[in-house]
């Protein structure tokens, strides 16, 4: 009986870990805020447990998430939004003191080791502005619609009028 329970538990864990994966983590600057876009897959029925953290000088600082307790110094500076396959964290008043390696990690539940994570090293003077990234990287449907509309208008000779 114990063997059957162990096998069932192992299969459940394998199924969940296969269905939850961080696909990318990007960083950019919006005004004076750092924006972290954590894109992920979730093909399992289990809810996603996640954590954003900063490692600076070998010390890990939890910023936000459902795993771990965010440090007091970051609580008032973070703003979080979530979509189906993306978690977005804003860190306001970003300065060179906030430079380091940022991590987005997915967990099974509680304080278990992460099943998937991505890192990005952030340096203030190397950050790009988000405006150029967000239009194309987050929502390309409007661009596709515009291109198709222009082709349709050109095909109907509307452009030559």
From Swiss-Prot:
One of its GO terms (molecular function) is integrin binding. GO terms for cellular component: apical plasma membrane; axolemma; cell surface; dendrite; dendrite membrane; endoplasmic reticulum; external side of plasma membrane; extracellular exosome. It is a lipid-anchor; GPI-anchor. Residues 1-19 form the signal peptide. Gene3D superfamilies: Immunoglobulins (2.60.40.10). GO terms for biological process: angiogenesis; cell-cell adhesion; cell-cell signaling; cytoskeleton organization; focal adhesion assembly; heterotypic cell-cell adhesion; integrin-mediated signaling pathway; negative regulation of axonogenesis. The modification Pyrrolidone carboxylic acid is found at residue 20. Residues 131-161 form a propeptide. The modification Phosphoserine is found at residue 82. Glycans are attached at residues 42, 79, 119, 139. A lipid is attached at residue 130 (GPI-anchor amidated cysteine). Its main location: membrane. Residues 20-126 form the Ig-like V-type domain. CDD domains: IgC2_CEACAM5-like (cd20948). Keywords: Cell membrane, Disulfide bond, Glycoprotein, GPI-anchor, Immunoglobulin domain, Lipoprotein, Membrane, Phosphoprotein, Pyrrolidone carboxylic acid, Signal. Disulfide bonds join 28-130, 38-104. It is found in: Cell membrane. May play a role in cell-cell or cell-ligand interactions during synaptogenesis and other events in the brain. This is Thy-1 membrane glycoprotein. It comes from Homo sapiens. The gene is THY1.
């Amino acid at each position: 009986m114990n063997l059957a329970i162990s096998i069932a538990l192992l299969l459940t864990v394998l199924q969940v870990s296969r269905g939850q994966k961080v696909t990318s983590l990007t960083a950019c600057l919006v005004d004076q805020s750092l924006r972290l876009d954590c894109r992920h897959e979730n093909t399992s029925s289990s809810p996603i447990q996640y954590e954003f953290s900063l490692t600076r000088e070998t010390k890990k600082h939890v910023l936000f998430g459902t795993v771990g307790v965010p440090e007091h110094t970051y609580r008032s500076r973070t703003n979080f939004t979530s979509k189906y396959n993306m978690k977005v964290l804003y860190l306001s008043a970003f300065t060179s003191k906030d430079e380091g390696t940022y991590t987005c990690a997915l967990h099974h539940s509680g304080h278990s080791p992460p099943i998937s994570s991505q890192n990005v090293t952030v340096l203030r003077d190397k950050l790009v502005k988000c405006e150029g990234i967000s239009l194309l990287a987050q929502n390309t449907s409007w661009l596709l619609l515009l291109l198709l509309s222009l082709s349709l208008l050109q095909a109907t000779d509307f452009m030559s009028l």
